[in-house]
UniProtKB/Swiss-Prot annotation:
GN (gene name): Adgra1
Protein name per its UniProtKB record: Adhesion G protein-coupled receptor A1
InterPro entries assigned: Adhesion_GPCR_A, GPCR_2-like_7TM, GPCR_2_secretin-like, GPCR_2_secretin-like_CS
Location of the region described as Disordered in the Swiss-Prot/TrEMBL record: 216-236, 463-486, 537-578
One family name in Pfam for this protein: 7tm_2
Cytoplasmic side: 44-56, 109-137, 200-262
Lineage: Eukaryota, Metazoa, Chordata, Craniata, Vertebrata
Main location as per UniProt: membrane
Domain of life: Eukaryota
Localisation per UniProt entry: Membrane
Bilayer topology term: Multi-pass membrane protein
Amino acid sequence: MTQWDLKTVLSLPQYPGEFLHPVVYACTAVMLLCLLASVITYILHQSAIRISRKGRHALLNFCFHAALTFTVFAGGINRTQHPILCQAVGIALHYSTLSTMLWIGVTARNIYKQVTKKALPCPGADQPPYPKQPLLRFYLISGGVPFIICGVTAATNIRNYGTEDEDVAYCWMAWEPSLGAFYGPAAFIALVTCVYFLCTYVQLRRHPERRYELRERTEEQQRLAVPESGHRHGVRPGTPPTCDALAASQLQNEHSFKAQLRAAAFTLFLFTATWTFGALAVSQGHFLDMIFSCLYGAFCVTLGLFVLIHHCAKREDVWQCWWSCCPSRGDTSTTKPGAHPTLDANGDALGHTACLQDSPCPGKLRGFGHPPASHCKMTNLQAAQGHVSCLSPATPCCAKMHCEQLMEEEAAHIHMAEEDVYPHDPHLHDPHLHRCLKGRTKSHYFSRHQAAAAEREYAYHIPSSLDGSPHSSRSESPTSSLEGPMGMHTLACCAQADPFPMVSQPEGGDTSPGLYGCPPHLSPGPAHLEMLRRTQSLPFGGPSQNGLLQGDVREGLPFGTDGTGNIRTGPWKNETTV
C-alpha cells in the first residue's frame, strides 16, 4: 500500500463531503448500544432496581437526549445539500444539547437535596410524612426551557439555523444568534450544576455520616414497627425508643452519595468534552479533523461505557435482574439433581440463604457480602453461625394458598410411625414450603462461595444425639406437640421463637411473627398442631452455645432432669441416659 492510499483511508475528501470520519460512526454506534442497554434494563426492571423515582427519570431522560444529540450529529451534521433538513438538524441539536445538560443539572440538584434532607422522623412520631412532589416540574424545566429557547430563536428568524453561507460545511446556527441562544444558556447551566456539585461536596465533608440515600417506610410498615419496638430484647420498659435512620427507612439507592456525586460530575465532563470534540471535528481543516474525530470517538465510547458500567454493571440488583432473564441461570437446586440443598439450623432446605430483594432488612446493602448484625429474622443457631435468612414480605401467600394442603399433609404424617428419614424427609423438600422462600438469583461471582457454603452447612447440620449416635436425634424426638395453635406451615412461612432456647436471642431481635403479616392466632382445634424444631446437641467438654459448660448438663438444658439423670424434653419424655 502506497503512502497515497494510506492517506485516502485515514482521511476524507475536502469539505463539504457526504461522510464523516469512520471512527465517528463506529464510536457513536457503540455509545448508542450502551445507552440502549441501560434504558431497557431500567424500564423492564424498574421495580427491582433500588433507585429513587427522581433518579430513574433523570437517568432515562439523560440517556434519551444524549442518544438523540449524538445520533443527529453523526447522521445529519454535514447534510448541507438540503436546506430544510439542515435547519431541522440545527434545531434538534440545539434542543437536545440544552435538555441533556439540564437533566444532568436536575441530577445534581436531587443529590444535593438528599444530602441536605432533614433526618427522618422516628416510627410512631406525630410528624407528618414528607409530601410526594410531582415530577412534572422537572420535565417542564428540562424539556420546556430548551423548547422555549429554540422556539423563540426559530420564530425570530428561521435562517438562524442551517448554513450561514456556502463556505460552512455543517448544519448548526449562525454565530451571533448562537451566543445568546445556546452558548450563554449552556454556560449558565454548567455553572449552576457545578455549584450544586460543590455544595454537595461541602455537605458530605461536614456530615460524613450521611452516606446513603434513604426512603421512608410506608404507613403500614410504620404501624408494624411501633409495636415491634416495644418487644425488643434488651430494652427496658419505659425507655424511649431510639431514632435509627436505617431502622426507620430502607436504602433508596445502592450507590452512596459520594459515588453518585462523582458519577454525575464525570458524566457532565464526558458529555461536554464529547460535544466539543465533535464540533471541532467538523469545523477544522483537513488534518485536524482526523485528530478531533479520534478524540470524539474516544470520549464518546467512554461516555457510553461509563453509563453502562456505573448504572448497571456495578449494581448487584441489576446483575440479579440480568441473570433472572437468562434461562440457563435458573435455580441450581432444580437443575442439578445431585447437588446438596442448603440447610438451615433445623435441617430444613432453603432456596437461598441471602436476604431477598424486598426483605425487611433495612441494613442489607446489595453488593456487600456482610449481613447486618440486627433487624433480620434469624433463628437461634443461625445467629450463632452468622447465617442470615430473611423472609419475603410475600410470605402470607404461602399460608393463604397452601394452608389447606399443608394441614392435610400434616394430619397424614402425624399418625405415621417414627422412622429415620433424614435427610430424605418429605417436609424438607416440599416444593410448596420453598415456593414462598424463593429468592432472587445471585450474581455470577457469588456462585462459588455459595456452593462452598452449602457443602459446609450440609456437613454441619447432620443431627446427632448426646451420645454421638446420628440416628437417635431424629427418631427419638417427638413428632408433634400441642404447645400452640399455630399450624405447621408457620414454621416455613413465619419467623417464630425457638421452643428450645439453647442459644440466647440476638440483641435487638424480635420473635413476633406479626412483622411479616402472619396471622397472630388461628382457631384452636385438634388439627392445628405445631411441629417441634429439631435441635442439635453439642459434644461434652466444651462450652455450649448459651455460654455454659457442657459438663453441667442440668444447667445448659432448657428442661430439667429427673432423679435418675434422664432428660425431660417436653410433653413426652425421651429417656436418654447421660
